[in-house]
From Swiss-Prot:
Enzyme Commission identifier(s): 3.6.5.-
Major localization class: cytoplasm
UniProt name for this protein: Tubulin alpha chain
GO BP term, pick one: microtubule-based process
Species this protein is from: Lepidoglyphus destructor
Subunit text: Dimer of alpha and beta chains. A typical microtubule is a hollow water-filled tube with an outer diameter of 25 nm and an inner diameter of 15 nM. Alpha-beta heterodimers associate head-to-tail to form protofilaments running lengthwise along the microtubule wall with the beta-tubulin subunit facing the microtubule plus end conferring a structural polarity. Microtubules usually have 13 protofilaments but different protofilament numbers can be found in some organisms and specialized cells.
Length: 450
């Protein structure tokens, strides 16, 4: 079996986790108490969904997941909520005091007290696996736990499970709306620390998803539940090929192989289609080519940046539902003829396709319409460098005045870590710039250095 362990860190990670596991349970017909009426082979775990759920002798299905937060309130909602019986109590780990939006608290002072406990729980889950494939880590860049504790955990996971893949789903600080003043600090510190430990990081920013909810679903004031359910659909699409048998299946390492041309350039952009409300879906056909085209519109991306300003290095299209390869090939051919989409000249083909016959499931009473087919596009484009540039700029404005730095230093960090992290991100921006150059231009610049 190729199992995956999900780790949900901090408030954002836990709440996205709730949306994801709610959706997985609906997709597999697992009840909130973990029973699965359709599963006839009790206790033997040879079905595809066993990559995400382990089975007990009594036929209960338990998510292979750990929830971690340094303060209890958010995880307490899981402990008392609808799915309280789904999780093993040991899988829900909470500390006593908050990381207070402070990377240093999450990474040094408070994080280090709880990290061994978390690794112990992860070890127990890993021991139940026959062939652990890797980890999916859900967190935000802006919070203290999400940034600080995640980077600590990633470092330790690299030590304990060296070769296993680690994929991140990270909530990137939105350009306009912000939940904390120090988000740029936390984001840049965590990106620097996890850059070498993460194999692939899918970023979503709240503002982009707000806009999608407002525009496509006509929700005037989207709540976090609305946002997370949409993120849940995306995560479900990415992991569907791990949980169902399909025509063209994709496993964790395959994402990396096809999306990451260089180890540091591992931040694909995520787009999902169709995001549509039930009233509208009733009147629309949504063919394969329509939903494929929708993916290439900047308005449907999960991070605010404009791929028309950048070049695509690789592109992964994950279809689910009533889709046949013939339609997909036609849709891709049509896109290639449109000259609006530019690929780097050293990667001419650049499309990987996954098809899964399990149609998308939606949460009953939710905002999304039930559709016959959906597509999730993961594209590695140089345009995402815009997102880093924005963040770096905000970091510079604050750091020039050393604003808020004393909170971090007071928790045992050194000021040098800030400048080191900032230099690393400057290098990352440069890497993106160089990757986007045509191979002939790149050779010229290399020649000038010597």
């Amino acid at each position: 079996m190729r199992e995956c362990i999900s780790v949900h860190v901090g408030q954002a990670g836990v709440q996205i986790g709730n949306a994801c596991w709610e959706l997985y349970c609906l997709e597999h017909g697992i009840q909130p108490d973990g029973q699965m009426p359709s599963d006839k082979t009790i206790g033997t775990g040879d079905d595809s969904f066993n990559t995400f759920f382990s089975e007990t002798g009594s036929g209960k299905h338990v998510p292979r997941a750990v929830y971690v937060d340094l303060e209890p309130t958010v995880v307490d909602e899981v402990r008392t909520g609808t799915y309280r019986q789904l999780f093993h109590p040991e899988q829900l780990i909470t500390g006593k005091e908050d990381a207070a939006n402070n990377y240093a608290r999450g990474h040094y002072t408070i994080g280090k007290e709880i990290v061994d406990l978390v690794l112990d729980r992860i070890r127990k889950l890993a021991d139940q696996c026959t062939g652990l494939q890797g980890f999916l880590i859900f967190h935000s860049f802006g919070g203290g736990t999400g940034s600080g504790f995640t980077s600590l955990l990633m470092e330790r996971l690299s030590v304990d499970y060296g070769k296993k893949s680690k994929l991140e789903f990270a909530v990137y600080p939105a350009p306009q709306v912000s939940t904390a003043v120090v988000e740029p600090y936390n984001s840049i510190l965590t990106t620097h620390t996890t850059l070498e430990h993460s194999d692939c990081a899918f970023m979503v920013d709240n503002e982009a998803i707000y806009d999608i909810c407002r525009r496509n679903l006509d929700i005037e004031r989207p709540t976090y539940t609305n946002l997370n359910r949409l993120i849940g659909q995306i995560v479900s699409s990415i992991t569907a090929s791990l949980r169902f048998d399909g025509a063209l299946n994709v496993d964790l390492t395959e994402f990396q192989t096809n999306l990451v041309p260089y180890p540091r350039i591992h931040f694909p952009l995520v787009t999902y289609a169709p995001v549509i409300s039930s009233e509208k879906a009733y009147h629309e056909q949504l063919t394969v080519s329509e939903i494929t085209n929708t993916c290439f519109e900047p308005a449907n991306q999960m991070v605010k940046c404009d791929p028309r300003h950048g070049k695509y290095m690789a592109c992964c299209l994950l279809y689910r539902g009533d889709v046949v390869p013939k339609d997909v090939n036609a849709a891709i051919a049509a896109i290639k003829t449109k000259r609006s989409i530019q690929f780097v000249d050293w990667c001419p083909t650049g499309f990987k396709v996954g098809i899964n016959y399990q149609p998308p499931t939606v949460v009953p009473g939710g905002d999304l319409a039930k559709v016959q087919r959906a597509v999730c596009m993961l594209s590695n484009t140089t345009a995402i460098a815009e997102a880093w540039a924005r963040l770096d700029h905000k970091f510079d404005l604050m750091y020039a005045k050393r604003a808020f730095v004393h909170w971090y230093v007071g928790e045992g960090m050194e000021e040098g870590e800030f400048s080191e992290a900032r230099e690393d991100l400057a290098a990352l921006e440069k890497d993106y710039e160089e990757v986007g150059l045509d191979s002939t231009e790149a050779d010229d610049t290399a020649g000038e250095e010597f």
